[in-house]
């Protein structure tokens, strides 16, 4: 017997509702974080992975530009002269070669300090540590872009370093929001004492600032990488 049109439409609607309910029930039984084939996708873990990858890239690039500034004819003579001044214990060169402005930030140095510090305070400390390089790297790219005879290899590395550091800072800010949603972050980035040298019209002053930056950046990038790995372990329990 053929169903009336109204009954036929009702049956189709009922079938659609039942199908939707079955699909909803199946979806509800799947963990909320199962977004990809192969397992659970955790945004916090992925952001830590992203930050660690950027820190690794930053560390590699810092070492590369350090070597190139010592070897490239654009800067090798100036850097060799500054090294000689450091050996002679010239105060200005010695400070540029050994003092890093990021040391003004109170960071955990001992193993038990990493364990005892609150997660949110740890993240905030790293934000200020990474943020300490925002201004120096921005001005480095600015000054290198304006200088004559700057090798493209040095300029491109400086740009990539600046971009990676900025993105790393964004990752850390996102992590802070996730671990402490109500936390208010007061950014306290220390000023870079050699900024005035970099912005100077004198070539020797500019290279003195680059000498300081190249000697500190690799060390700080390695420190950031180490602490990101520790923080990921403490926060997510992964890769401990």
From Swiss-Prot:
Compartments, record wording: Secreted
UniProt xrefs under InterPro entries: 4_helix_cytokine-like_core, Somatotropin/Prolactin
Annotated GO MF terms: hormone activity; prolactin receptor binding
Keyword Transferase annotated: no
Disulphide bridges, residue numbers: 33-40, 100-216, 233-240
Name of one Pfam family that matches: Hormone_1
Glycosylation sites: 212
Main location: secreted
Expression across tissues: Placental basal zone cells.
Stretch forming the signal peptide: 1-29
Keywords: Disulfide bond, Glycoprotein, Hormone, Secreted, Signal
A single Gene Ontology CC term: extracellular space
Biological process according to GO: cell surface receptor signaling pathway; female pregnancy; mammary gland development; positive regulation of lactation; positive regulation of receptor signaling pathway via JAK-STAT; response to nutrient levels
PANTHER family membership: PROLACTIN-8A6-RELATED, SOMATOTROPIN,PROLACTIN
Family: Belongs to the somatotropin/prolactin family.
Protein name in UniProt: Prolactin-8A7
Source organism phylogeny: Eukaryota, Metazoa, Chordata, Craniata, Vertebrata
Gene that encodes the chain: Prl8a7
